[in-house]
Design a protein with these regions (language model features):
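Bacterial N-terminal signal peptides that target proteins for export
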Residues: 1-9
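Bacterial N-terminal signal peptides
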Residues: 8-19
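Boundary at the C-terminal end of the N-terminal hydrophobic targeting segment
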Residues: 22-24
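Acidic/histidine-rich, surface-exposed loop or edge segments in extracytoplasmic proteins
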Residues: 30-44, 95-104, 143-152
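N-terminal targeting signals for Sec/Tat export/insertion, comprising classic cleavable signal peptides
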Residues: 33-70
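Metalloprotease/metallohydrolase-associated module, dominated by Zn2+-dependent proteases
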Residues: 59-63, 67-70, 74-89, 93, ...
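Short pre-active-site segment immediately N-terminal to the catalytic Zn-binding motif
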Residues: 100-116
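Catalytic Zn2+-binding segment of zinc metalloproteases
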Residues: 120-136
Length: 181
């Protein structure tokens, strides 16, 4: 079993075995949550703030709530992270597709929320592509809709999309305008 496969299995076991500690962000308050989860109180607060302040982030969250994609949000230290933000496909099981979004912790709330929006846009791209059911189909989809964002290595390829970049910029603009009020 490859290192990635062992990691994915362990992560899936952790995600399935600990649903009671996962928090579902539901900006509408209508009980449709469960698709955005985190055990990080700061990320939970920032997600709540972002969905109250940014129409763009709110729309991304609503789209995910209406999808079969479940997103786990994690923060990681900048000195151990290969990128500021990244999304990893974990598994498709039980009618859901599970992804993990890892975010570097920033001091700026606005920057953190904008990065979260960028990565959640990627989760929406997966929600919009029902054929994405594993890492290989995810790579195929990103080769189709996006572009390579860095030089690939033997164990890692990174992609981005114009839509995700635009979502992050738009959310940052909305947050900055809200601060001016």
């Amino acid at each position: 079993m490859t290192r990635f496969a062992r990691y994915a299995c362990a992560l899936l076991l952790l995600l399935v075995a600990t649903p009671s500690i996962a928090h579902a962000a539901d900006p509408s308050g209508d009980g449709l949550g469960g698709h955005l989860r985190t055990t990080d109180d700061r990320l939970r607060r920032l997600l709540d703030l972002g969905t109250r302040t940014s129409p763009t982030l709110r729309a991304l969250v609503r789209r995910l709530i209406d999808s079969d994609v479940v997103v786990y949000l994690w923060c990681e230290r900048a000195d151990t992270a290969p990128a500021d933000g990244r999304l990893t496909f974990v598994s498709a099981a039980g009618g859901h597709r599970y992804v993990v979004v890892r975010l570097v912790r920033f001091h700026s709330r606005e920057r953190q929320i904008a990065l979260m929006a960028h990565e959640l846009r990627h989760a929406v791209e997966i929600a919009d592509a029902p054929d994405v059911v594993d890492a290989e189909s995810l790579e195929r989809e990103y080769r189709r809709i996006g572009y390579m964002s860095s030089t690939p290595t033997a164990d890692r390829k990174t992609f981005d999309t114009r839509a995700a970049v635009d979502a992050g910029v738009q959310v940052m603009n909305e947050l900055m305008l809200a601060d001016d009020d």
